[in-house]
């Protein structure tokens, strides 16, 4: 605990919070162009082929973002919408691609958590 004299001499430092997604420049999402679409393997205890894309954003940053859901239609030069959110077992992946927005198709045959994967509500089955 500083004394009054110490506070007069040198004021308290302001705590600056660091953004977890600096490439978005304080926006909720940003548009970008895929420069490379590929698969990569996760960190040690996990094993899979995770689908990721390198995206050049409108802010000028080039980021690696994760493509969630089963199957995708992305390729080089696809226009995508990128949101924040890291993938714990993929180092360097701090962004997600929004499914069902711009060139990214929603996940087919998805019935639960549809809004997260850009899937429309299925037509009611006729009896």
Curated annotation (Swiss-Prot):
InterPro entries: NA-bd_OB-fold, Ribosomal_uS12, Ribosomal_uS12_bac. GO terms for biological process: translation. Pfam families: Ribosom_S12_S23. Gene3D superfamilies: Nucleic acid-binding proteins. The keyword tRNA-binding applies. Keywords: Methylation, Ribonucleoprotein, Ribosomal protein, RNA-binding, rRNA-binding, tRNA-binding. This is Small ribosomal subunit protein uS12. The lineage of its organism: Bacteria, Pseudomonadati, Campylobacterota, Epsilonproteobacteria, Campylobacterales.
């Amino acid at each position: 605990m500083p004394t009054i004299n110490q506070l007069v001499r040198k004021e308290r430092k302001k705590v600056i919070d660091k953004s977890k997604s600096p490439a978005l420049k304080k926006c909720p999402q940003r548009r970008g162009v895929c420069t490379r679409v590929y698969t990569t393997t996760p960190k040690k205890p996990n094993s899979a082929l995770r689908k990721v894309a390198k995206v050049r954003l409108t802010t000028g940053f080039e980021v690696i973002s994760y493509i969630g859901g089963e199957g995708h239609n992305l390729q080089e030069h696809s226009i995508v919408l990128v949101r924040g959110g890291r993938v714990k077992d993929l180092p360097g992946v701090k962004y997600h691609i929004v499914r069902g927005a711009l060139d990214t198709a929603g996940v087919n045959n998805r019935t639960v958590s549809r809004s997260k994967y850009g899937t429309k509500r299925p037509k009611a089955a006729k009896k």
